[in-house]
C-alpha cells in the first residue's frame, strides 16, 4: 500500500513542492548568514533584565537576529524552564500535609519515651531494672566445690510478676521462690561453695575421709611382707588356736596329759617337797 501511494502523481507533486521550498529557504537564509552582526542597545538596568525572564519576540524581530543570538536565546529559555519545574515540585511537596502526630499517653519516667499502651510501657520499664553485679565466688578446694560466676551482661530469668529471686550468698537469680529455696538448701548442707565456715569444714572432713578410704583400698591391693601373716592366711591350720582367737573370753579347759607328762609332774612335786 505504501509503494502504491508513493507511485501516485500526487506524491511526486508534493516531492517537487518540498524541493522548491528548500531552495526558497536557502535563498532567503544565505544573505542572512553572510550579513554582519548587528549591534543592539543594551538596557541600563541589569537587575531588572536579570530578574525578568526573556520574553518571546515577534516573528519579524526574530528574523533580524543572527544565528548565534538565536541559539543563545533558545538556551536561555531552556535554562529558565528548570527552576520552574523544581519550583512546582517544591510547591507540591509543601502542599502535602505533614504526618499526624500520634498521641502517646503512657510515658517512661526514666528515658522520656512514650508508648501507646500500658503493657508496652511495662515491658520497656523492665529493661531499666538494675542488674546484679558481677560476682565470682571460689572455695579453698577447687577439686571438690565448683566455681560459681555471674556475668552482668547475662540475661537472668525474671518471674512474670517482675520480682527477682536472688540468692544472698552467691547472687544467683532464679525465676521462682521454690527454685531459690532448693538452691539455698545446697548452701546449708555444704554441697556448694560460699556457704560459710560449716560448709568448708564439712567439705574438708569429707576430703580427709575419702583420702583414708583410698589409702585402705590401696593397701588391700598388695601384700606387705614386713607385716605378720593374717590368721586366715596361715599355712598350718590349728583349730584350737583359731577357737581361742575367735572366743577370747572362754573358760579354762582341762589339759589332756599323757603318761610321760604325769611322771614328770610327780617328780617335780617330790622335788619341791
From Swiss-Prot:
Report biased composition (Low complexity) as residue ranges. 44-54, 201-213
Residue spans annotated as Zn fingers (C2H2-type) read 106-128, 165-187
The record's section on SMART domains has: ZnF_C2H2 (SM00355)
Q: Which domain of life is it from?
A: Eukaryota
Enumerate the UniProt keywords alphabetically: Abscisic acid signaling pathway, DNA-binding, Jasmonic acid signaling pathway, Metal-binding, Nucleus, Repeat, Repressor, Transcription, Transcription regulation, Zinc, Zinc-finger
Output the InterPro entries linked to this UniProt entry: AZF1/2/3-like (IPR044653), Znf_C2H2_sf (IPR036236), Znf_C2H2_type (IPR013087)
In which residue ranges is the amino acid composition biased (Basic residues)? 34-43
The record's listing under SUPFAM superfamilies reads: beta-beta-alpha zinc fingers
User: What triggers its expression?
Assistant: By abscisic acid (ABA), ethylene, salt, cold, dehydration and the monovalent and divalent cations Li(+), Na(+), K(+), Cs(+), Ca(2+) and Mg(2+).
Expressed in which tissues: Expressed in roots, radicles, cotyledons, hypocotyls, leaf veins, stems, sepals, petals, stamens, placenta, funiculi and maturated seeds.
Q: Where in the cell is it found?
A: Nucleus
Where do the segments described as Disordered lie? 33-64, 195-215
- According to its UniProt record, where is this protein mainly located? nucleus
Q: Which GO terms describe its cellular component?
A: nucleus
Task: Cite the Pfam families for this sequence.
Answer: zf-C2H2_6 (PF13912)
Q: Which GO terms describe its molecular function?
A: DNA binding; DNA-binding transcription factor activity; sequence-specific DNA binding; transcription cis-regulatory region binding; zinc ion binding
Instruction: Name any Gene Ontology BP term.
Output: negative regulation of DNA-templated transcription
Q: Does the keyword Ribosomal protein apply?
A: no
Q: What happens in the null mutant? A: Delayed senescence and hypersensitivity to ABA during seed germination.
Q: What else is known?
A: Plants overexpressing AZF2 have increased sensitivity to salt stress and barely survive under high salt conditions.
What's this protein's function?
Transcriptional repressor involved in the inhibition of plant growth under abiotic stress conditions. Can repress the expression of various genes, including osmotic stress and abscisic acid-repressive genes and auxin-inducible genes, by binding to their promoter regions in a DNA sequence-specific manner. Acts as a negative regulator of abscisic acid (ABA) signaling during seed germination. Probably involved in jasmonate (JA) early signaling response.
Q: What PANTHER family would the database entry show? A: C2H2 TYPE ZINC FINGER TRANSCRIPTION FACTOR FAMILY-RELATED, ZINC FINGER PROTEIN AZF2
What is the name of the protein in this document? Zinc finger protein AZF2
The organism named in the record is Arabidopsis thaliana
